[in-house]
UniProtKB/Swiss-Prot annotation:
This is CCR4-NOT transcription complex subunit 6-like-A. It comes from Xenopus laevis. Mg(2+) 1 binds at residue 235. Mg(2+) 2 binds at residue 405. Its cofactor is Mg(2+).
Length: 550
């Protein structure tokens, strides 16, 4: 796990006492360190109410036990219990995951609770002067012994075989009983590629639960239980697409399309097996593949750099990709009422999937990658919708579903751009870097568009998970937030329902500080929505769109 900067407490423990004048002037006292000394034998229960404490000195006393309530001091980074008479430690001490230093020297400890393995942020563990068992001492005395001991305890900590509670299905709208329509389900899921699932990043997870051979079963169980008509996956390893995902889903009636990140093109066959990418699967009894496309963001950045150093040095160097499939909705699935108003036409559906750059410091890159992808999708849709002799096609003429790990929060420029149809060309997420000339290439009307200071995309999109229906889609120790999305054409579709979040009380009861976890195979939660596709619209008559009828 990346270590944040940690400054140990000052051993001198200097303090100041407020003067009468300071008290009279309303100065507030603040203290977050506490020392208790004087050969104390027991601790007051009121100590466990001081949840603001970050440092607690309890050394050189006569304490024979520490109560489980120690876990209530969830802000502790330093705990000194040295030189007491402790014979055991409460398992609950392992829940104080904020700890950086835990000093247990010179006690009577023979064993340690395996729960201490959860203290993945520890930088110092003092165990000298204890009659510990030989297996503990042997590990502890090895080079990097503290880390090896903690890993051993975490890996051997028993995990209750408790079944994951079902996530609730949230109905948002009843299906239209008057006008004919068709409904289908869409899943979006970042499965956490094996090479990214390291102890350095996920130190709170046992190594066996990070192992791909263990996680892949939970991931496939999640995909199969959702039983979606369309499945969009990110961080799919190339080899796993061909040996796991495609064969397993093909057996269940799916076809699929996959592309790895751009770096795979310059790698050996052996190396490219481990490059991750994006995949889309669709149920063949409901859809047929018409077109498939891969969008390489670094190639588009190079072609549209317009002399911008930021475009070349920041955007072009990232090898993220997006994929899309143009599908035909089967007539026997859509029903007679869903037939297009031109009998020769097909009912088409565009589905796109992308994974944007991860680094929070590169908000400009994420926003431009999103613009490039949407601009390419607009071109694909316009070509597919174009008929000889017809005027310039409307990008909203074909229903569109966008699934993505955008690595961007709800208040980001990326989400604003997708939801509102555009953003200002001086949006703060561009970080005042020189992109203006490049951005016009991705504008709705191209370089000839009105220079109104906005970059627009022309689609009319809405998020399936509006109104904070999901408090987080990515859940790690350091970060919990919404970064995964399903967008859809609001002129063509409605959301009938979505899969809700996991019970937060269950997460709390099971001390799940981050994912992956033995019960949760990825650091992301899947999204699942049911969409209702409306009949195509006939030409406008007297200013009104009339739906096609039988």
């Amino acid at each position: 796990m990346p270590k944040e900067k940690y400054d140990p407490p000052d051993p001198r423990r200097i303090y100041t006492i407020m003067s009468a004048e300071e008290v009279a002037n309303g100065k507030k006292s603040h203290w977050d360190e506490l020392e208790i000394s004087g050969r104390v034998r027991s601790l007051s229960t009121s100590l466990w109410t001081l949840t603001h404490l970050t440092v607690l000195h309890l050394s050189d006393n006569n304490l024979s036990r520490i109560p489980p309530d120690i876990a209530k001091l969830h802000n502790l980074v330093y705990l000194d219990l040295s030189s007491n008479k402790l014979r055991s430690l409460p398992a609950e001490l392992g829940n104080v995951v904020s700890l950086r230093e835990l000093l247990l020297n010179n006690n009577l400890l023979r064993v340690l609770p395996f729960e201490l393995g959860r203290l993945f942020r520890l930088q110092t563990l003092g165990l000298k002067g204890n009659p510990l068992s030989q297996d503990i001492l042997s590990l502890y005395q090895e080079p990097d012994g503290m880390r090896k001991l903690l890993n051993y305890m975490l890996d051997n900590l028993s995990v209750h075989p408790e079944q994951l509670p079902h996530r609730p299905w949230i109905t948002l709208k009843e299906r239209d009983q008057i006008l004919p329509s068709v409904s289908f389900t869409v899943m979006c899921y970042n499965v956490l590629c094996d090479k990214y699932a390291t102890r350095q990043l996920y130190g709170y997870c046992p190594s066996w639960a990070l192992n791909w051979e263990y996680r892949k079963k939970g991931i496939m169980d999640e995909i199969i239980s959702c039983d979606a008509d369309i499945i969009s996956l990110q961080e799919v390893e190339t080899e796993q697409y061909f040996t796991l995902f495609m064969p397993a889903l093909e057996e269940r009636g799916y076809d699929g399309f996959f592309s790895p990140k751009s770096r795979a093109k310059i790698m050996s066959d052996q190396e490219k097996k481990h490059v991750d990418g994006c995949a889309i699967f669709f149920r063949t009894e409901k859809f047929s593949l018409v077109q498939k496309h891969t969008v390489e963001f670094n190639q588009i950045a190079m072609a549209n750099s317009e002399g911008s150093e930021a475009m070349l040095n920041r955007v072009m160097t990232k090898d993220n990709i997006g994929v899309s499939v143009l599908l035909e909705v089967h007539k026997d699935f859509s029903g007679a009422g869903m037939k297009p108003h031109h009998s020769s036409e097909k009912q088409l559906l565009m589905v796109a999937n992308a994974h944007m750059h991860w680094d929070p410091e590169y908000s400009d890159v994420k926003l431009i990658q999103t613009m490039m992808f949407v601009s390419e999708l607009k071109s694909i849709i316009e070509k597919a919708a174009c008929r000889p002799g017809s005027p310039t096609p409307d990008p909203n003429s074909i229903p569109f579903v966008l699934c993505a790990d955008l690595n961007s929060l709800l208040d980001s420029g990326v989400v604003e751009y997708l939801t509102n149809g555009g953003v200002a060309d001086n949006h703060k997420d561009f970080k005042e870097l020189r992109y203006n000339e490049c951005l016009t290439n991705f504008n709705c009307n191209g370089k000839n568009g009105t220079p109104d200071g906005r970059i627009t995309h022309g689609f009319q999109l809405r998020s399936a998970y509006e109104n904070n229906l999901m408090p987080y889609t990515n859940y790690t120790f350091d970060f919990k937030g919404v970064i995964d999305y399903i967008f859809y054409s609001k002129t063509h579709m409605d959301v009938l329902g979505i899969l809700g979040p996991l019970d937060p009380q269950w997460m709390m009861d099971n001390n799940i500080t981050g994912c992956p976890h033995p019960h949760i195979p990825s650091d992301h939660f899947s999204l699942l929505t049911q969409l209702e596709l409306h009949p195509p619209l006939l030409p406008i008559i007297n200013g009104v769109h009339l739906p096609s009828r039988r």
